[in-house]
């Protein structure tokens, strides 16, 4: 797309060597599981996005190949191929083999650059068994190849001249090293979600993904940028005003973009990004937005006498944000990331900039669009009234529990340990399974809470109504950290919550209802990795005095074939947890030595919000469509 040659070997700065990467890969890409594997693709794509941010690229193609490799192609300026003075090697080779070598550290070649770990393609090279690069620049096509990070020097060559009108650009194709990664199989959906997000955040850049293994493909191009992102997130919701509110500004080299739309939902959905990174832990940009939003809404509401119902109180932030979908995107030349997972923006100056932009532009928008302002404020007033009712309900609950002999729910069989780090709570479907679990557990560190039937669907109710539900109240009390905005993970009584439901449709529904409650009202538990789903076996196979458990039909068939010579003594199918006696339940599902647990994680909060809304919200159409689209992906079928 661009022939701009400001970006050459002279702009490539080198900060440190590559030796440690293969020894400690997790330090550089976070982990060596599926998340780390996909991070490799994001590192390469981030380079192409940086070219786009600098105005030199508007098309990026990602392809998953049948041989397990992945390639990323862009139409940017092409990685420099001229000789690097310090190393006396081609700049391309330096970028690929030296950690932190790149044109992103002097703010001249790139004003803004993404990439959470910022480790660049050299780490991708170090963690690949093989990597190939094709560069189109300086009037020619160049290729180079690397094996386990080592340059195959004789393979750096100028292949041919560029054709007249042919685009410049870079293609990187790599094969992840299966000696390092737990899995080397890329997941189309995981990549699709991230690439869609990047296309929303970088309007006008076309990003395509194709999968040779399945012939699946997707192309994303959003001229409306984060405006369209908000529309996408609200697809299954009812908006309170037609147009998405959008404003942007630049101050001190920091770009701010904000889009929002209020809906009639009870859950808000606010997503903040810094340099294209999903800042899941929030940060100064989010704080600035929330503070200014609450102030602007209260200023407008007070000046138009709209808060008479609240007995002189102002609206709180949580009232204003109820049902609000918003995307905040800042681009910063020198972002500082903090927090446990380095996904919290720490630059203090950003708060003031976002506050002032929001105060000024949203205030003006409200004055010019009184109908929209009224719709948003009426919803917030309704939320404030419900919050006050919920407070009364909570106080009532607290008073009630203080009168009871113990503040813990009667049906909780607690564990002896008082150390949350070694304690686990099994949340069990049904009293009969609860009885078996209580008898089969190790009471030193395992607590059991049986739940009767299906709990309330919290997606459709406010907190005051939720707190009226006995089963939910018992669960909140047992976990111990409170609920909603006041939830405090430090006060949680267990660091493992294990959802134990039957392996049928009802069990899956109950598990989804529980996850909705935990995600919406105790989300830190999921973010800290405290929530698990038990995986009880579906089948038990006996043969000549030996017992084998199978999680699914495929495993059952393999056991029958390989362990029982095709002729088992007995095959038992567990229809429900209640069918297992205490010993079987301990043996298959509760014993830490041999049980299988599935940790519940949230990779992408925007996708999770949308998913809970589709599955548990009011709109039937999107749910039907989702079931239709994913019927073939189901992991089990209940007959």
Curated annotation (Swiss-Prot):
Catalytic reactions on record: ATP-dependent breakage, passage and rejoining of double-stranded DNA
Record text on subunit structure and interactions: Heterotetramer, composed of two GyrA and two GyrB chains. In the heterotetramer, GyrA contains the active site tyrosine that forms a transient covalent intermediate with DNA, while GyrB binds cofactors and catalyzes ATP hydrolysis.
Keyword Nucleotide-binding on entry: yes
Names of the cofactor(s): Mg(2+); Mn(2+); Ca(2+)
Cofactor, how bound (note): Binds two Mg(2+) per subunit. The magnesium ions form salt bridges with both the protein and the DNA. Can also accept other divalent metal cations, such as Mn(2+) or Ca(2+).
Stored CDD domains: HATPase_GyrB-like, TopoII_Trans_DNA_gyrase, TOPRIM_TopoIIA_GyrB
InterPro entries (UniProt xref): DNA_gyrase_B_C, GyrB, HATPase_C_sf, Ribosomal_Su5_D2-typ_SF, Ribsml_uS5_D2-typ_fold_subgr, Topo_IIA, Topo_IIA-like_dom_sf, Topo_IIA_B
Miscellaneous comment in the UniProt entry for this protein: Novobiocin inhibits DNA gyrase activity by binding to GyrB and blocking access of ATP to its binding site on this subunit. The mutations in GyrB causing novobiocin-resistance probably produce a gyrase that binds novobiocin less avidly. Few gyrases are as efficient as E.coli at forming negative supercoils. Not all organisms have 2 type II topoisomerases; in organisms with a single type II topoisomerase this enzyme also has to decatenate newly replicated chromosomes.
Domain of life from the UniProt record: Archaea
Organism the protein comes from: Haloferax lucentense (strain DSM 14919 / JCM 9276 / NCIMB 13854 / Aa 2.2)
GO cellular component: chromosome; cytoplasm
Regulation: induction: Expressed in mid-log phase; not induced by novobiocin.
One Pfam family recorded for the sequence: HATPase_c
Protein name: DNA gyrase subunit B
GO molecular function: ATP binding; DNA binding; DNA topoisomerase type II (double strand cut, ATP-hydrolyzing) activity; metal ion binding
Comp. bias regions, Basic and acidic residues: 392-402
Gene3D superfamilies: 3.30.230.10, 3.40.50.670, Histidine kinase-like ATPase, C-terminal domain (3.30.565.10)
Subcellular location: Cytoplasm
Region called Disordered, residue ranges: 392-417
Family, similarity comment: Belongs to the type II topoisomerase GyrB family.
């Amino acid at each position: 797309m661009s022939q701009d040659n400001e970006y050459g070997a002279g702009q490539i700065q080198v900060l440190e060597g590559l030796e440690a990467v293969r020894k400690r890969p997790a330090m550089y890409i976070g982990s060596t599981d599926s998340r780390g594997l996909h991070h490799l693709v994001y590192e390469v794509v981030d380079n192409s996005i940086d070219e786009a941010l600098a105005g030199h690229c508007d098309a990026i193609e990602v392809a998953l190949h049948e041989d397990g490799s992945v390639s990323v192609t862009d139409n940017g300026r092409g990685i420099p191929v001229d000789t690097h003075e310090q190393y006396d090697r081609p700049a391309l080779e330096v970028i690929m083999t030296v950690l932190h070598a790149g044109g992103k550290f002097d703010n001249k070649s790139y004003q803004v650059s993404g990439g959470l770990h910022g480790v660049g393609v050299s780490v991708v090279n170090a963690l690949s068994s093989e990597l190939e690069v094709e560069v189109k620049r300086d009037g020619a096509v160049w290729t180079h190849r690397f094996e386990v990070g080592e340059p195959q020097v004789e393979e750096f060559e100028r292949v041919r001249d560029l054709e007249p009108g042919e685009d410049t650009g870079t293609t990187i194709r790599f094969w992840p090293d299966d000696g390092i990664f737990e899995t080397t199989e890329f997941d189309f959906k995981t990549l699709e979600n991230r690439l869609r997000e990047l296309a929303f955040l970088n309007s006008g850049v076309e990003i395509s993904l194709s999968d040779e293994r399945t012939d699946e493909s997707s192309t994303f191009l959003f001229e409306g940028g984060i405006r369209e992102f908000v529309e996408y997130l609200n697809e299954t919701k009812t908006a309170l005003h037609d147009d998405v509110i959008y404003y942007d500004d630049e101050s001190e080299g920091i770009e701010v973009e904000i889009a929002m739309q209020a809906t009639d939902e009870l859950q808000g959905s606010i997503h903040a990004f810094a340099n294209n990174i999903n800042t899941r832990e929030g940060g100064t940009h989010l704080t600035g937005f929330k503070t200014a939003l609450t102030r602007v809404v209260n200023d407008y509401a007070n000046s138009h006498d709209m808060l008479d119902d609240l007995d002189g109180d102002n609206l709180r932030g949580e009232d204003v944000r109820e049902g609000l979908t918003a995307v905040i995107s800042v681009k910063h030349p020198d972002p500082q990331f903090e927090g446990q997972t380095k996904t919290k923006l720490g630059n203090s100056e950003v708060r003031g900039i976002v506050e002032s932009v929001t105060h000024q532009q949203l205030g003006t928008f409200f004055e010019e669009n009184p109908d929209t302002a009224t719709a948003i404020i009426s919803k917030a007033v309704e939320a404030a009234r419900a919050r006050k009712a919920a407070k009364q309900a909570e106080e009532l609950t607290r008073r009630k529990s203080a009168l009871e002999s113990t503040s813990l729910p009667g049906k909780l069989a607690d564990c002896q340990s008082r150390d949350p780090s070694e304690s686990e709570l099994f949340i069990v479907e049904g009293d009969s399974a609860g009885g078996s679990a209580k008898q089969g557990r190790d009471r030193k560190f395992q607590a059991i809470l049986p739940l009767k039937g299906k709990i309330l669907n919290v997606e459709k109710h406010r907190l005051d109504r939720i707190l009226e539900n006995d089963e939910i109240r018992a669960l909140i009390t047992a976990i111990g950290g409170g609920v909603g905005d006041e939830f405090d993970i430090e006060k949680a009584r267990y660091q493992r919550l294990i959802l134990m439901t039957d392996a049928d449709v009802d069990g899956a529904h109950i598990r989804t209802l529980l996850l909705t409650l935990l995600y919406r009202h105790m989300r830190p538990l999921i973010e800290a990795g405290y929530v698990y789903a038990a995986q009880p076996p579906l089948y038990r196979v006996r043969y000549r005095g030996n017992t084998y458990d199978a999680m699914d039909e495929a495993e059952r068939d393999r056991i029958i074939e390989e362990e029982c010579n095709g002729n088992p003594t007995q095959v038992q199918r567990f229809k429900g947890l209640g069918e297992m006696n205490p010993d079987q339940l301990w043996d298959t599902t509760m014993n830490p030595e041999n049980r299988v647990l599935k940790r519940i994680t949230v990779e992408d909060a925007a996708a999770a919000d949308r998913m809970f809304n589709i599955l548990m919200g009011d709109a039937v159409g999107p749910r039907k469509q989702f079931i239709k689209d994913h019927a073939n992906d189901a992991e089990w079928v209940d007959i």
